[in-house]
Structure formats: structure tokens, C-alpha cells
Amino acid sequence: MNKNLLPLGSVVLLNNGSKKLIITGYLVSTPEYPDHIFDYCGCMYPEGTIRSDTICVFNHSEIKKIIFKGYLNLEEQKYLENIKRQKLLINQEN
């Protein structure tokens, strides 16, 4: 996990990707990878979540370019710090 997670609403382009994604959540797992926790979940931009199978999961290390950084205030900063602590605890358990 990268030390500085991006705020919700950030728009990114992934390595080997041609479609922009907007970040909509953090610390998610999938049925396909139940033992892996991804840094982010998101959906295609500008389409949004069209169907549940259009949700993407990815890690910060997969981001090639940050196109737009989402809104960040003190509340979000505290939340991101908490998420980083949770991810460290999860990694220590595995």
C-alpha cells in the first residue's frame, strides 16, 4: 500500500489501461481473490457504475497517472490514516 492513498473521487489511469477510473472505495476484496485486500475499488469514468460487474478493484501500485485528485478535507485525511492502520494490521495477520 502506498503511504498516501488518494481521496474518493480521484480519477486515475491504470498501467496498461486505456479507460479512466474514479475511486469509490477502499480496502475491498472480491470472491475471486478472497484472501487479498485491494487498496481501492472504482468504476469507469465518466460512465459510473452501470452494473455490479463493472466495479474494478486495484492497488495504488497499478496507477500509472493521476488525472484528478478528489476532495480532501480533515475528515477524509483522518479516515485515510485509519485505513492505512487497518491495512497494516491486515498485512501483519497474513
Feature locations, PLM:
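Short beta-strand-centered aromatic/proline hotspots
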Residues: 19-29
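Short, solvent-exposed secondary-structure boundary/capping segments
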Residues: 29-38
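Intrinsically disordered, low-complexity, charged/polar segments
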Residues: 41-94
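Short, well-ordered loop/turn sites that connect or cap secondary structure elements
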Residues: 3-6
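A generic structural signal for short beta-strands and their flanking turns/coil linkers
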Residues: 19, 39-41
